[in-house]
Each structure stands twice: as C-alpha cells, then as structure tokens.
Amino acid sequence: MWNDEDNNPYGTSFDRRDSQSSSINPTSPSTREYQRFEPPQTPTSDSDNEHNHGVIHDDSDDDDEDLTQDAGPKRKPGGYDSRIEQILYENPKLSILITDAGKSIESGGRYIVYTIKTGDLEVRRRYSEFASLRDALTRLHPTLIVPPIPEKHTMADYAANPTNAKQDQQIIDLRKRMLAVFLNRCRRMEEIRTDGVWWRFFDPNASWSEVLHSHPVASIPKSILKAPPLNPANPTPAHNYLPIPAASAKLKTVAGTNHDNSSGHIQAGPHAFGRFPPEGHNLGEQELDPYFISYESSIKDLEQLLTGPMEKVNRRTLSHLSSLAADLCELGSVYNAFAVSEQAPSLGPAIERIGQAADLSYIATEELSGSLGASFAEPMREHAQFAGVVRSVLKYRVLKRVQQDLTTEELSKKRALLDQLEQSEAEARRIENYLSSSQQISPPPKRSTSLREPPSHQRRDGSQEDTESIDSDFPGTHGDFSSHTPSASQGLPERSTSVPSHKKMPSGNSITNKIFGPIRHAVQGVVDVDPERTRRDLIGKTRESIGQLEQAQVVSEKDVKEASASVLKDMKRFQKDKEDDLRRYMLAYAQSQIEWAKKSKQQWEEARAEVEKIDES
C-alpha cells in the first residue's frame, strides 16, 4: 500500500513517490540556496517508504545542483517579507506536502490538524482554515477557477457514525491527499502563487486570523460585484454606485445569437474549432457570450457524467474489489489450514503454495482497490466539483454583464426623468412670467377698502356713546367717586364672563386633533405644499444621480472587459489542465490494472509449478 501522502494522482509521473523525498532543504542558512526538486522513484511497500524519508540524491541530481548553484536561483526584486515567500518565489515548482494528519496536541485533541511542509518549514492548519483560504482566494480572484477542497461531512456520515464521524480515519486520509492536491494546484497558478495571502498561509509565524481580518481580505466589499474583478480589495468610489443584480439574473436574449448558444456539444480537444474564440479577433461582449454559454453547457454535461454513471460504476468496482480481497484472504487461510492437515509429502506443499498465492492475491487486490480509489475515483469526484467552480466563475461574468446593462438602463431612465423635469420647470417658468406680466398691466383696485373704514369708526363711536348713556342711568355705588365716567371696559362685564367658555374649546377639540392630526399630516405630505421647490430639489438629485451613474457606467464597461478577458484566459488554462488530467487518470487506471495482473499472474504461475510437482502415484 502507498503512504497516504503518496496517493497523489496529480503528480508529473504515475510511479509512486516518497512523501518526503520531494522536500528541499537549504544547503546553508546563510546562502539560502536550494536543491532542484527531482521526484525519485518510491518503493512499493510501506516498510520501504519509512526508510526513505530523507532527501534522496543521485549523480544526476548532483550535476543539476551544481548547474543550479552556478546560475543562482531567481530572486525577487526588492527583497522578501518572510522566509516562506523566498522559498515559494525561488522554487515555483516545489511540491507542497502534507506529511501528517492527526489530533492537535495544543487543543487537547479536540480537532484534526494537518501538517504542511514547504521546503524546510512546517505549519499546522485545520480544515476550516483551508476552507477560509479558498474562500479568500475566491473573493480576491473572482475570475480564476480556484481548485476545490474535499467536501465537509455530510448528514449521512454523522448518521452512520454519530460519535466519531470527525475522527473517521478514511475521511482524514482522503482529506490529507486532496488538500495536498488543492495546495499544489494553487501553487501552479501564477496569480495565486504571487498573492501575499497565499504564502502567509504557510508561514508558521503568521496568525491566520489576523490575515483574514486585515488588508486585503478585509478590504473586499461585502458584494464582490461592487469591486473591480482584477483588484477587488481596492474598489474605486464609482464602484459604490453600481447596481447589484439578482443572483438569478440572466443575460438578455439578443436576436441572431440563438444558433450560437445551442452549439454546446462541441468536439473535444485543445484545438477544436468553436470551443474558444479565435486568436487575434477583437470580439465584443455579445459576440463572446455564445462561447461562454457553450463551455458552460459542456461542463454541465461532464458534471452529470461524473456524478451519475461514472460515480456509480466506480463505487461498485471498489466494493467488488474489496469483497474479492476479503474472499481471497479467507480462502488463503483455509488452504493453509488444509495443507497442515495433509500428510502427503508432495500434496501438502502444493496446497500450502495455493494458499500463499491466495494471500498474495488478496494483498495485490487491496492495493488495486486503494490505487484505483486514489488515482481514479477521487480525481473524478474532484473534477465534478470543478464543474461547479467553473459555473460560479461564469456566473460572475454574467452578473457583471447584467450589471452593465442595469447601469445603462438606469442611466437612460434618469436622463429621461431629467428631461421631463426640465420641461416641467420651463413650463412653470413660462406660466409664472405670464402671470407676473399680467399683474403689472392691471393692478387690483384699492378703493373698496377705503370705503369700508368710516362705518367702523362710526360704530365704534356709537357704541361708546350708548355705553356712557347706560352708565349714567345706573351710577356706581363702589369704587372711586371722583371718576363719574367709567371706561368702556368697565361697562362690559358680560364679555369677561364669556372668556372661560372660549378657553375650553381647544380642550374639546384636542380629541379631534389627536385623531385627525396624523391623517392631516399624511395628506399634507401627499399634497405638495411647495411643488416648485420640490421639483427643483428633484432636478438637483437627478443630475447628481446621472453623474454617479455615468461614472458607474465607465467602470462597469471596464470591469466587464477585464472579467471576460481574465475568465477566458483561465478557462483555456483549465481546459488544458483538464485534458492532461483526464489522460493521466486513464493511464493510471490502466497501470494499476497491469500491475495487479502481473503480480497475480506471477503468484499463480509459481503455484501451478508447485502443483505440477505432485506425485501422482
């Protein structure tokens, strides 16, 4: 059986490799020169693997190392921020290894940690930290097809093993292999390899929590659509004005492109016509849409194939091989017991040799089951996850296109509204000018007011004379006798008694005010008391919105072009890697079958030779 970390089906060779032989150690801490990584051949048993955990050298490696030291490693201009950055920058082809997976000693064994070895540095990370790394890379590079990580525990896992689901050794070994594949896939992507967040994940002196809560991860907007696609951590002020489309938004169907959208089933191959737009052609976004739609359709078909028939066949095959191995193990023990009970000098050894062949076939079948699972079944499940990643990247590009259309539509609406408001304002000014000119021609008469004034004075004088005559008939008996003529205010006692009744009126209307006050306020809010001022304020706000949308339109157009170019570039890279991977998987499948058949054939040929020695007499 291979070591867990050796079950990496994505290496550059199908031969088994030692988990530690690919690590590099500096020749001296002062020079910081590194040996060129050259994966050696790995023995076929675990016991042999345990003796090869050091750095393996051969003559060719020494010669290449001398050449490397003469030329010197590629150094970064401006220096390095940390040791791990230097290792990753100067050794871009260095494999990242996960050497161990087990319970954390620091946490008292509450969770599983994975030991990552990069050169001569080691760091321990949890599965949740791997998930946060991938999430950060996805947000920092929304146009890149970031490799997936193994899935979390499903409800079926907890139902089957409710107490020890997280400590299931098979799941831990699977994650150990696939997380190493994830790290090495990311390492081969230049945009990620040069990202500071990426190499800080391998820095034992860096706090991963602080990395996630600092720039650039913390500077990414809550909605990735309000950020530039190539630099989401540094959005411009104009990005704040971009509208956010719904997650289910789709592109508008343009007449004349339907025939392109339905050309999904295209020939396979890196140079197949129609998979990608031709080189050297400057196509518009609407002309690029059919290529993206066709690629998404082909990826969806591949996902259905991998998660449907292929997954079922792989599960049945591995199950049958495991059952066959168990039967061969039992058969070997039966033959061995039978050989002990047989007293014939030639028959006993032959039966024993049959039992040994069955035992060795059991071991070979177990190895076949493990190698097929690691080199074929697991990669197929990973590619099914890749299909979902590709769809999400293409969906991001679609949402950027929809965002551009929404910005253009909103800008057109605001401009139409501004034209309407300006026309209304011009009409209102025309009417106002007409009314003001009419008032200057015919001023209103003022004679009627002057005619009404004398009667009021006469009434006031007459009322005063009547009051004085009444007071003379009824002289006062109290007060100051020196004053025989009381004032007019003293002759009106009834009016003073009517004041309290008037003071009670507001208290009687307070209930009405409480009931109808909010209604009156709402009606006044609906019925504009100053339509001219409201119209002018609305014109100002509309002009401001138009200015913001014009800025948003410029950045949206730029974002769509950058997103389409970056997505298309990474799609080509992914397509090439996918075809290389599928070719490697098929060869690995055939190689595993060949090795199993050779071992089985050799054991049973030796058993047949022993059986032919049986004395027939």
From Swiss-Prot:
Task: Give every PX domain span.
Answer: 89-209
Would you say which domain of life the source belongs to? Eukaryota
Q: Which UniProt keywords apply?
A: Autophagy, Coiled coil, Endosome, Lipid-binding, Membrane, Protein transport, Transport
* The family this protein is said to belong to: Belongs to the sorting nexin family.
Copy the domain comment. The PX domain binds phosphatidylinositol 3-phosphate which is necessary for peripheral membrane localization of ATG20 to the perivacuolar punctate structures.
* Record's protein name: Autophagy-related protein 20
Provide the GO MF annotations for this entry: phosphatidylinositol binding
